Structures are given as C-alpha cells and as structure tokens.
C-alpha cells in the first residue's frame, strides 16, 4: 500500500493491531453472535479520523444516496437525519477534498486489506459456515465473492432505527464509533441496541424495519470514541438505534459491512 502518511511497515503494524483486537474479542451468542471491543483503531489512526473528518457539505443523506428504498422521499423520514459518504465508491470518496481525501483514501485501503477482511469474517466463521452450509471456512472464498462496503456516517438530531436484521446480502457488520455530543452518556443509549422479539421465535429474512414496541431491548453498545460493535447477520439479528428524546444529538461513526455473492463458475 503506497501512501504519504505512513511507511509500509507502519501500515502492516496497524493491520496486525486491528486483527489482534478482532480475533481476541469475546463473542456473545444470544440472541445472535455479536461483540463489543474498546480501543479498536490504532492511536495514530483514530487521531487522524477526528482531525480529518470531512466537512458537512461532503456528506449526502441516506435518501439522496439511494441507500434507502421503498420509502416516501420526504424530509421527515428518519433516513433524512443520517448523512453518509460511501468510502468504497470512488465517486463518493471523491467528494472529500484536499488533505482529508488523502487520509480517507488511505483509511479505506487499510481497512479493506485482504488480511483485515479475512479476520473480520473469521471471528464469525462458525455462524457464516452454518448459514451458507459450508464445510470449511476456505469454501467461503472458493464459492463466493466477498465485497466490503465502508460508509462514513454522521447521524443528526432525530435519527433512529427500528429493530431489523439487516440486508440479507450481508455476512457481518462492524460499527466503529468516532464521536458524539460530549455529554451523550447522560441520556438515552447512543450505541446500537440488540433486540429480542416479543413473539417467540419470530425471524425476518428480508431485513425490514419493525416497531420498537414489538421487541425487548436486551443490550445497548456504549457509544464511546474508538469502540467497535459487531454482529453476524442472521434472520434474528435484530438491532437498531433508540431515538434520543431529550435534546438534539449527533453521532459520527463508520459502518463496515461485508457482502457476499455467489461466484459465476461457468
């Protein structure tokens, strides 16, 4: 990886630090495989994440980006309060200008290195093999294309997400928390919440959003700088974001999703 920020050896060291954090994380298996780990990114990287955060006009809303479909395109929809830059799409990454672009281009290449991607999948290998009916972990790469997607997110004011299992094309999701209002810890949970359906055994294959009233919240991740919350996508991986009622709140984070698609071997 060629860059003007860090030497090759430093970059490889950053990869190893992240892999160490992920592989040694303690997975909780109920109600679906997930974990939370502190201080995920190397110190040198998280400092630059904050220093080189893109300007507001370089983000676009979920509705404008096309990330949300089958909804009325109105500003009252919750997706209007989530702004994003898809770092793995050249056109969106190019919205970032100057020195900021240099860093985020480096950051994207760092987090999508083959070793990092394999570690992100390996931690959930048993669940992935069970879901896809694979005999061993290597079969995943033999039979499927693996596609990482990194979305830099800025949630504002009234943003919330109802319980959902997520896009069925995803294998795993990693949420890296960067920054929020200084006193957010005094209010409602800011991190992603885990839910169990009131209706015993209820599952959802499509990943549509459901009402909070139909679920019990059993856990909320701590929204703290450099915390990572991750889960393996299943038909009961219900998660969401609680709406903060007391005052306007902002959150800055990265959503790292790994998608899969069957290889065409013809």
Give, region by region, the residue ranges found by the protein language model:
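Short, flexible segments with low predicted structural confidence
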Residues: 17-21, 91-92, 138-140
């Amino acid at each position: 990886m060629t860059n003007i920020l860090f030497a090759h050896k430093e970059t490889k060291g950053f990869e190893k630090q992240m892999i160490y954090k992920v592989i040694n994380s303690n997975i909780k298996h109920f109600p679906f495989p997930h974990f939370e780990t502190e201080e995920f990114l190397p110190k040198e990287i998280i400092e630059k994440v904050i220093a080189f955060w893109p300007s507001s006009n370089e983000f676009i809303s979920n509705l404008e980006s096309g990330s949300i479909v089958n909804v009325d395109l109105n500003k009252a929809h919750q997706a209007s309060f989530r702004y994003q830059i898809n770092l793995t799409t050249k056109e969106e990454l190019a919205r970032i200008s100057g020195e900021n672009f240099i860093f985020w281009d480096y950051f994207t290449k760092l987090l999508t290195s083959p070793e990092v991607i394999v570690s992100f999948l390996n931690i959930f290998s048993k669940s992935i093999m069970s879901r896809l009916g694979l005999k061993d972990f290597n079969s995943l790469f033999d039979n499927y294309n693996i596609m990482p997607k990194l979305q830099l997110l800025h949630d504002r004011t009234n943003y919330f997400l109802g319980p959902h299992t997520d896009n069925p094309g995803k294998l795993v999701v990693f949420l890296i928390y960067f920054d929020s209002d200084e006193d957010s810890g005094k209010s409602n949970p800011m991190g992603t919440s885990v839910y169990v359906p009131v209706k015993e055994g209820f599952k959802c294959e499509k990943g549509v959003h459901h009402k909070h009233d139909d679920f019990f919240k059993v856990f909320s991740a701590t929204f703290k700088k450099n915390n990572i919350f991750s889960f393996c996508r299943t038909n009961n991986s219900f998660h969401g974001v609680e709406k903060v009622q007391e005052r306007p709140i902002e959150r800055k984070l990265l959503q790292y999703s790994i998608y899969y698609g069957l290889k065409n071997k013809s």
